[in-house]
Amino acid sequence: IESVKKRVINSERNLACLLSGGLDSSLISAIVAKWVPKGQLQTFSIGMMGGSDLKYAKMVSEHINSNHTEIILSEQEFFDAIPEVIYNIESYDTTTVRASVGNYLVAKYISEHSDAKVIFNGDGSDELTGGYMYFHNCPNNMEFDYECKRLLNDIQYFDVLRSDRTISCHGLEARTPFLDRTFVNNYLSLPIEFRNHNNNKNSNNKIEKWLLRQSIQENDPELLPNNVLWRSKEAFSDGVSSHNKSWYEIIQDRLNSQYSENDFKSKCEKYNHNKPTTVEQLYYRELFDSHFHNKDKIIPYFWMPKYSNVTDSSARKLDIYKEKNKMSKTNLTIDVNC
C-alpha cells in the first residue's frame, strides 16, 4: 500500500491504471483508487472480442468505481502492430513481443484520448512472488527462491523492458509499485516456505501468489471482488484473446505460409545467438535486424517456462494451465479460508 501511495501523492501529473482484470493490475488499481477522488480514477483495458480478461477488468472497475475504458480491437489490428512494437521495444523475444502488443496499443490509445501521463501497472509481481504458472512444478523451496531472484535479476530484459518502452514511447510515464525496493526487500526477507505456494498443504486447490492473496483477504477483504482476488493466473499475452483462439495461435496462423520449408531453414542458419526455431521467432528476428543489425545479444536468451517440456512460451500450453481451466469449467472453487 505504501509503495502505491507514495507514487500517487508525489505525482504532479494526471494518472491512470492499466487494468487487465488479473490479480496484480486489479490490486494496484484498487489501492490507487483509495488515493484518488471517488469516480475520478481512469482505468484502461484492452483485448480482442471474447478476450478472457475483459469481463474481470470491468468487474474490478465497477467495484472500485473507476472511469473505465475498454478497448476492443480486431485480430488483424493486433497483428499489424507487431513491426512497430518490435522497433519500439528493441526486442525479438517471443514472449516479450506477444505481451508488448497489447501494452503498446493501450498506451497509444491513452496518449491520444486521455490527459493521463502517469500510468500505473501491476508488473513485477510474478517475478517477485513466483506467480507464473510454471512455478506449480517447482521441485523445492530452494529452487523456488532461486528462480524468483533469477527472474528479478533479468527483468530488465523482459517484463520491465516491455512495460517501460511500450508506455514511454507514447510520451507516458510508467509506475511499477511491485518493484519498489523496500517492498521487494521486505517480501524476499520472508521465509521461503511461506512464499512458496506449493507448501500450502491444507489447500484443496493450490493457487499461485497464495501469500499475497491471503494477506489481502485477511487485512482488506473488501478491496477486490472475491472471484478476482482468487482468480488463477492468466498471462496478459494470453488474456487479450479468447480461450477458443489464443493470441499466439493467431500470430502463428498468419505466419505459417510466409516461409517455405527450405527458406525457413536457410534463414535460421545465419543466426548463431538465439537461433530461431519457429516461423514466429524468425519473423520477429528479421524485423529486429532491419532496425538493429548485429545487436541480437541485447537479449541474452528466449524467455521460457521452466520445469516442463513445452516448446512454446504461452502459459496455455502448460499442463497445469489446462488442468486449472478444466476445473474452472466444472465449477470447482478454491478454499479461500485454507
List PLM regions with ranges.
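ATP-dependent adenylate-handling active sites, centered on carboxylate activation for C-N bond formation
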Residues: 1-219, 236-249, 265-277, 281-338
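A short alpha-helix-loop-beta-strand transition element characteristic
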Residues: 222-232
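N-terminal, charged/glycine-rich beta-strand/loop interface patches
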Residues: 255
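Surface/interface-facing alpha-helical segments and adjacent flexible terminal/loop regions used
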Residues: 258-265
